[in-house]
A protein has these predicted regions:
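Helix-coil boundary/capping segments in enzymes
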Residues: 1-120
Length: 120
């Protein structure tokens, strides 16, 4: 995951303005995860949507941003033409098994049959 820069100024804003306002449980309803193991036919160095970030990275990030809060995710597939969509979907499902309050949206591509999608 990219370096996270959380400074004293950020902590000050959290303590003075947000800590008493932000609820005890948070749901990030639009987030992406990525693992280069599922880059498929993609070439070149990772960038943009290809930021290596998994479920634990999201939790670590949230613990710094929202200390003392419970945190869950709705993870959307990372749609990059040429990637291994099936591997990506399976990896996301495995990552989120640890958190029944979180969910993923399966990434569906035109080459997936309705029967295949229904079986998932």
């Amino acid at each position: 995951m990219a370096a996270f820069d959380y400074q004293d100024f950020d902590r000050e804003i959290w303590h003075k303005e947000l800590e008493d306002f932000v609820p005890d449980t948070l749901y990030d309803m639009h987030t992406h995860m990525w693992c280069e193991a599922h880059k498929g036919a993609l070439t070149g160095a990772p960038s943009g949507l290809r930021l290596e970030i998994d479920y634990q990275d999201h939790l670590d990030w949230a613990a710094k941003l929202y200390p003392g809060r419970e945190f869950h995710l709705l993870v959307l597939g990372t749609p990059i033409p040429g990637m291994d969509a099936e591997g990506h979907n399976n990896w996301m499902a495995q990552e989120l098994k640890a958190d029944p309050e979180s969910a993923i949206n399966m990434m569906v591509t035109p080459d997936m049959s309705p029967e295949y999608v229904a079986e998932q």
